[in-house]
A protein has these predicted regions:
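An N-terminal, well-structured beta->alpha segment
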Residues: 1-35
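Internal, active-site/partner-interface "lid" segment
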Residues: 145-146, 171-196
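Glycine-rich phosphate-binding loops that contact phosphosugars or nucleotide phosphates
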Residues: 34, 38-174
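Catalytic cores of large soluble enzymes that bind and process phosphate-bearing ligands
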Residues: 2, 6, 21, 47, ...
Length: 196
């Protein structure tokens, strides 16, 4: 497989994923985030753990209080940081990841008031995490882009683009100013822009 064909294939899958998104569910997720009084916690396992961490980083950089919740740490004491005012967003291709399910189940046992949302690409009915979520957002991924159709390439790209798009939408909706954005970024090239 040539790299440019893989690149092109990912773009096609992203277009398909966008066209198949159930807009009312996207709106529901946006509304859920906007109505959250506490923090957002993104959680995922494996490659989707990196997706979750990137989402939390982007949201927080746009002045939306967000954190990455490591699933192993969560099951060994870190659940203490999640309160009834928070929203937990899980990322899983299958919706059946055992570690993510364990986190969701532990959160449910801790409090029925904690909001849990699952973002996944499993269109079958065997989705354990979805069963204990408040609601879920299905992201259509027709196939991965590798020779085995198993390496999480297209799914990671689709989840990442979705979260980046939501972050910008929400920051704009909340009226994030350039001054506030720059205040939160005193370092690097962005930090130099504030001094100009």
């Amino acid at each position: 497989m040539k790299w440019d064909s893989v690149y092109h294939n990912q773009l096609e899958i992203l277009r398909e994923a966008l066209s198949k998104l159930h807009r009312p569910h996207v709106t529901a997720l946006i509304d859920k985030i906007l109505s959250t009084q506490g923090s957002l916690f993104f959680v995922g396992v494996g490659k989707n753990g990196h997706v979750a961490a990137k989402a939390a980083s982007t949201f927080s950089s746009l002045n939306i209080k967000s954190f990455y919740l490591d699933p192993v740490e969560a099951l060994h004491g870190a659940l203490s940081v999640v309160t009834d005012d928070d929203l937990v967003i899980g990322v899983s291709k299958s919706g059946n990841t055992s570690e993510l399910y364990a986190v969701f189940a532990a959160l449910r046992e801790k409090s029925s008031n904690i909001s849990i949302v699952l973002v996944h690409s499993n269109d079958t009915i065997s989705n354990r995490c979805e069963a204990i979520s408040d609601f879920s957002l299905f992201v259509k991924i027709s196939h991965e882009c590798d020779m085995f159709n198993i390496v999480p390439i297209a799914s990671v790209a689709a989840f990442t683009v979705l979260f980046q798009s939501l972050a910008i939408h929400l920051a704009h909706h909340r009226g994030l100013s350039l001054d506030t954005f720059l205040e939160n970024h005193p370092g690097g090239h962005i930090g130099t822009l504030r001094k100009q």
